Amino acid sequence: MSQQFNVAIFGATGAVGETMLEVLQEREFPVDELFLLASERSEGKTYRFNGKTVRVQNVEEFDWSQVHIALFSAGGELSAKWAPIAAEAGVVVIDNTSHFRYDYDIPLVVPEVNPEAIAEFRNRNIIANPNCSTIQMLVALKPIYDAVGIERINVTTYQSVSGAGKAGIDELAGQTAKLLNGYPAETNTFSQQIAFNCIPQIDQFMDNGYTKEEMKMVWETQKIFNDPSIMVNPTCVRVPVFYGHAEAVHVETRAPIDAEQVMDMLEQTDGIELFRGADFPTQVRDAGGKDHVLVGRVRNDISHHSGINLWVVADNVRKGAATNAVQIAELLVRDYF
C-alpha cells in the first residue's frame, strides 16, 4: 500500500471512535492526513496518532472534500444526517451504526465472510458495519456454512456493557462501587440494575416479543450470507462484564458434520483462534485487545443428528466494531482505489 489516504473518524471521542484510532495505528493503515470529528462540545480535544497531535474538529464546520475514507461511529441519527453529505462529496463512508444496514443497496460486510459485497459501495458510497454480535457469530459459522450449509441458528448472547458505550461502562462501575459500599444503585442506561445481574433485554422490544438487538442478528445474518431461508433464533442478554461478548451458538446443518471436522476447519480459518478440549475462551481472560474471534466448546449436539454447538467470544469494541471497519477500509484501498 504505497498510496496514502486522507481518513476521517466521526465520533472520535467515543469508545469505538477512540479504538478506531488505535487500530488504524496498530495495523499501519496508509493514512496521509487524519481528521478527528465530533460534536461542538468535544471540539479541541487532542489525540496522538503516529507521533503527531491531532485536534478534534467540529463536524458542523468540516469540509468533507478533503477526505477519501470516513469511519462513522457517532450514532444513527448523526450518520443519517452526515453520511449522505460526505458520500456526495466523494467520501467512502464505513458506518458503524445500524442506520443503513438494511438498505438493499448498501453492502453489509464482514471481511472474513462476504468481502465481495464491498464492490457494491459504488451504489451510494456507503458501506455498513454489522452489529457486534452478528460479526463474531458469522466469522465462526462461515466455514460450517460453506462446508455443509446451515438450516437454523439458535444463539444466546452474553454481551458486555461496553456495547452500550461509555455510559454503560460508567454505570456498571458506579453501581458496583455503590453496592459494595452499602449504597443503592442508580439506574439510567439500562432497564434494570446491571451490577451483579443479567438483563435479557438489549434495545427496545418489537411486536413479535423479540428485542431489536435480537432481530438485528436475524436480518443481518440473512443479508450477509445472502440466504433469506436461514432461520435465526436469538436471545440477547446484557451481563456485568466491561468488555467482550460471548455467545452460546447451536446450529442445525443441512448435512451432518462431525465436531472434529468443524474444529479442523476453524483451526485453518483466518481470524479465528480455536480452543480444543476442556480449554475455552472467556471475555475477561482472553478477548480483551484481540482482533480474532475465539471459539471453544465445539461439540456435536446429542439431541440432534445434524447439530453443532459452539462457544464464541470476541472483543466487541475491536472485532465487533472498530477492527471490522478498518478491515473493510483495508480491502477497499487494496481492491477498489
From Swiss-Prot:
InterPro entries: Asp-semialdehyde_DH_CS, Asp_semialdehyde_DH, Asp_semialdehyde_DH_beta, NAD(P)-bd_dom_sf, Semialdehyde_DH_NAD-bd, Semialdhyde_DH_dimer_dom. Pfam families: Semialdhyde_dh, Semialdhyde_dhC. Its EC number is 1.2.1.11. The active site is at C132, H245. SMART domains: Semialdhyde_dh. Consists of two domains, an N-terminal nucleotide-binding domain and a C-terminal dimerization domain. Catalyzes the NADPH-dependent formation of L-aspartate-semialdehyde (L-ASA) by the reductive dephosphorylation of L-aspartyl-4-phosphate. This is Aspartate-semialdehyde dehydrogenase 2. It comes from Vibrio cholerae serotype O1 (strain ATCC 39315 / El Tor Inaba N16961). The lineage of its organism: Bacteria, Pseudomonadati, Pseudomonadota, Gammaproteobacteria, Vibrionales. The gene is asd2.
